[in-house]
């Protein structure tokens, strides 16, 4: 059911009859006027390349009560009485949800954080965006597969493994990802200090020497801070690392051994570390109702031979590049670039296939993993939720797939890009253990939310759902291509522009209906009462399916958030000035109850799609 589509179709028919133009052409150019006094639907005549001075008389219809030509626009006014009858004659519980006529099998890969320390606020946006678009696509009728890429064969995991072995493989303590994160940060900072001290022994120019001294001072300060958190671990690791003649050689041994899978002991230790960290991730993400269908291990790609297969194909068309092999991407045809969503005129750098020692790079593994995602799920589309800093590597990936003969995959691989998350007054570095973890964020938001709930004598049993809504709204309300500044004190506001505000508004609508004792019959409604904010709410309810499905199809949850917020604002303004259950006029009361019913459905289905739980009490 899509009431506003019915309105638009009738308007198109009226205008088509008046101007002698195809209804389909008109439909595509319709707009909503910036001010309600201008009309409810608008057609800009210049978009049809018509003479704007042409005088035409338009008729009206069942849903359209008046059509006016104002300047270069033809504006229509909806008959609110007929719209009310159309809307509430057919409204079902799933109002707004329209299953797509073209269902697809879609893989959404998101989060995919290195399993070396807890998830932090930098991962938060990725996780929430990935989970939300997965939810929205499922509601639309697509078959969605959520995947997490486990980067267990990289240098950072090798550094953590070295530290854990040097400590004697102690039993982890809760919360396990925080515990391993500390070991990783300590190990890494000790190695960096040692390497920097060696560099300072070289003959350096004054500026370079000064920069390295400043960097050393920063690392030493970080080391002191880390030592305060666990002096025993720090001192033991410092002694062990500084007694190793060549630390880099030890790290490379772990990397190469694990890549080959030929040392059962290394294999067992790395998998233990990685899987325990993933348990920590799952525990954190569960607080936000986020989960995955599949965890794909990078090591499995290597051991299965998939990466070697890709390399074998790539070497056939690769060129020599700085002592190794690379795919030349600079001169790709502009038509192919357009197909692959690569900006015109952009010269992509070569995609290097291997290190100088012949071992594969993450770029080559990404090609193999993309093939796996498509083949495992028989996917029509794969969506990679990855930060905007990875735009060039993602373009290289699509271009490389195309050159290697995977044209369909390249054309259906989507980079869902997003800007970074900034935490006011905090500079983050995962390597140095300087970050706000996802658990810290949830805890801090919980503290603020709990205080506000208690101030209102609210229901504390809903705390987890309120925290989830506050965090999700803060992330989703900003367009993905813009940065988010995360202010914990501002995201829990029951009065305006927040997840809890939308939940509070839903609870208000729900409880009006729950307390009602009247039988709500359409024939009893007073349609003359559809004025002011009630008319505005009626139009918003009618527009919900269009906004809802467009936001899903365009992967723009921020548009749905904005619509729900505007709807909640109008509803609360109306309810603060006009009673519903206390209205003595029975027919007016019925009309208002229908409006509340529509708002309750809009908020319920909209919030549910965003992963925000609609609450019946706050």
UniProtKB/Swiss-Prot annotation:
Top-level taxon in the UniProt lineage: Archaea
Top-level EC class: ligase
Catalysis performed (reactions): tRNA(Arg) + L-arginine + ATP = L-arginyl-tRNA(Arg) + AMP + diphosphate
SUPFAM superfamilies assigned: Anticodon-binding domain of a subclass of class I aminoacyl-tRNA synthetases, Arginyl-tRNA synthetase (ArgRS), N-terminal 'additional' domain, Nucleotidylyl transferase
Protein EC: 6.1.1.19
Chain location of the short sequence motif 'HIGH' region per the record: 113-123
Keywords on record: Aminoacyl-tRNA synthetase, ATP-binding, Cytoplasm, Ligase, Nucleotide-binding, Protein biosynthesis
Record-level GO cellular component terms: cytoplasm
Molecular function via GO: arginine-tRNA ligase activity; ATP binding
Location of this chain's protein in the cell: Cytoplasm
Cross-referenced InterPro entries: Arg-tRNA-ligase (IPR001278), Arg-tRNA-synth_N_sf (IPR036695), ArgRS_core (IPR035684), DALR_anticod-bd (IPR008909), Rossmann-like_a/b/a_fold (IPR014729), tRNAsynth_Ia_anticodon-bd (IPR009080)
Gene Ontology terms describing biological process: arginyl-tRNA aminoacylation
Pfam families named among the record's database cross-references: DALR_1 (PF05746), tRNA-synt_1d (PF00750)
NCBIfam families (UniProt xref): argS (TIGR00456), PRK01611.3-3 (NF002446)
Family assignment from sequence similarity: Belongs to the class-I aminoacyl-tRNA synthetase family.
Protein name: Arginine--tRNA ligase
Record organism: Sulfolobus acidocaldarius (strain ATCC 33909 / DSM 639 / JCM 8929 / NBRC 15157 / NCIMB 11770)
Gene: argS
